[in-house]
Amino acid sequence: MQHALGFGGKLEMHGKSETKLGIGVIGCGNISMTYLRNAALFGGVELRACADISADMAELRASEYGIRAIGVDTLLADPDIDLVLNLTIPAAHFDISLSALSAGKHVFTEKPLATSAADGRRLVAEAAKRGLLIGSAPDTFLGAAGRRARRLMDDGAIGKPVTGTAFMMGRGMEHWHPNPQFYYQPGGGPVFDMGPYYLTMLVNLLGPVERVMAMATRGQEERLITADGPFKNTTLKVGTPTNIVSLLEFRSGATVTFGASWDVFKHSNHPIELHGTEGSLRLPDPDTFGGTVSLSERGADWVDFASDSELYGARNWPYSAPDRANYRMLGVADLAGALATGRKPRASGELALHVLEIMEAILASGESRGSVAVNGTVDQPPLLGEEEAATLLA
């Protein structure tokens, strides 16, 4: 093990740099490009190697970012790697993260933490047992819009939260993704794929969920792949619900309707709205780091808070023609800061586990048509203040 960590003390790293967390990326597919590109923004992390089930893909990413392409086992044994960034497909998240923890590495994984809450609990327990940190996407709630919304909520801008809505609706993945099959199998679907952005933001703003009720259906049993690629004009069988309506009861007493559907052509619902005893708050798409947060105090006109000029809110993606803020890697940088100072990371495994338990409860309720308790709980992550957010930059 390359690390000695106690939450009362600071991390010791024995790698190339005593001040940077050495990152080894496993999984070099679509999402990896964002993380690899954004790594240079942050001072506490350093890319060192990458691996993929496809050696060619690993070599491509390595050549693009000036790092080594090596095998998975070699990466896990490499003393220069302090943290494994797990960007594999959801079905592989548990095995790769457990292997990394077993090798003495800290872990940050793409969402979901695992495809079952039982596996998620095992990962969180394994990290704790070994004195390692595990973090998980999404980290979008740490972006400019998420921080603004959290400050407003903490300041009592809407009073006591009473109710709200959250909607993720679209036509699914087969229209743009060349290999969309895994999105439509257990562990995929709109709740597991997109739900983490919405649910993580809601837990960040309202605290933990206590109980859910849901209905779940499939708009189609088969779907036609129209995206360019090897599977264009072929069909895939749907193995998980694609249209889910749920009611979330938070431990605070607030209730939120959460709808997630890949069976919608067009809609006009706002991504998230929260309503309290003193006003209402409207949030942008929680899959991005920026966008406009709007506040109405006691029925007054909406007051907009744009994010473009704020840290981790400026539009930077896609790089050729930016139309949204994408600072994936921010959660990894926050975890590096946690290791350096002895605090807990904000985009933590515990937070991701609670979100995973909520999602599992939603799908279970969708099957049983009864209410399902969310037995686990988590503390709201502490607000990422503006000064601390700036210290994460290179």
Where are the regions a protein language model picked out?
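N-terminal Rossmann-like dinucleotide-binding module
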Residues: 2-65, 393
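C-terminal glycine/acidic-rich active-site capping loop/insertion
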Residues: 6-8, 221-239, 245, 250, ...
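Beta-strand-loop-alpha-helix segment that lines the small-molecule cofactor/substrate pocket
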Residues: 13, 83, 89-141, 156
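Core-facing hydrophobic residues within beta-strands of well-ordered domains
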Residues: 45-47, 81, 161, 209
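Short acidic low-complexity segments
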Residues: 68-77
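Short glycine-/small-residue-rich Rossmann-like dinucleotide-binding loops
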Residues: 80, 88-89, 260
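Predominantly a Rossmann-like dinucleotide-binding segment in NAD(P)-dependent oxidoreductases
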Residues: 140-237, 369
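Glycine-rich phosphate/pyrophosphate-binding beta-alpha loops
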Residues: 259-268
